[in-house]
Amino acid sequence: MLKNEELLRFFKTAYCFTDSQRNTAYENWISENVKDKIVIDLGAGSGILCYLAVKYGAKKVYALERRGRLIHRMKEILGDTVEYIHADLLETELPECDIYLHEWLTSEFWNEKRFLRNFYEEGDKELEVGHILDLVEYAKKNNFIDKLYPNTVELSSIEGESITEYEDIKLYSHGKYSRQFIEEHYSDLTLNSIYKNRVDSKEVIWKGHIKDLKYMRVNNYLGWILSFDNEYEVSNHLPISHWGLRHGAG
């Protein structure tokens, strides 16, 4: 358990690579779409999405990450199979790519900074994060909004509850290469903090392409689903997820 806790402290928000629903959605889509393509992960964290892109035959893979220690760890795992960009997304000129992968770290769709305060003290550079709409605006400005994935969004007003628990990672439930990544490089990591989500009522308030996303507020919890052309969903209100309804409407 001590080793498990040390790894979670090291990764802080990047431990989402142990979430099987997240890994399965990304791996399924990557397996069908990256062969012979140039791919960048915008916030590579553990490096698992870059690992998947390499395994499924991407022509070139870039890992963009602002945290130096995570770049160092990725290099230990991925070596020279990817090119590393140690920089902040919104302050960086990106290479031309066919696919731009992104992921939202937190249950708080509009306010990632509020979530990150659980991990970092005020004034820490890690709190200098952009809003999801900043990413959308940046992608439009730099002409890759139609290459940004996941690319479809559903927002909803939800009444329900999320309970946090530690649960076995259940390697058997992960995709082939996601499972291999964890087995080969994080075999000591056996437990993950997850949300068990209960949805009592749900009203969809918006659904569309991420390029048309605008700020919306609800009186209850804000439920969200991100998907790849309406397939392979990740969500903060699936029955079990590392995202939850815990952080309010915002």
Where are these regions (language model features)?
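Phosphate-coordination loops involved in phosphoryl transfer and adenosine-cofactor binding
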Residues: 36
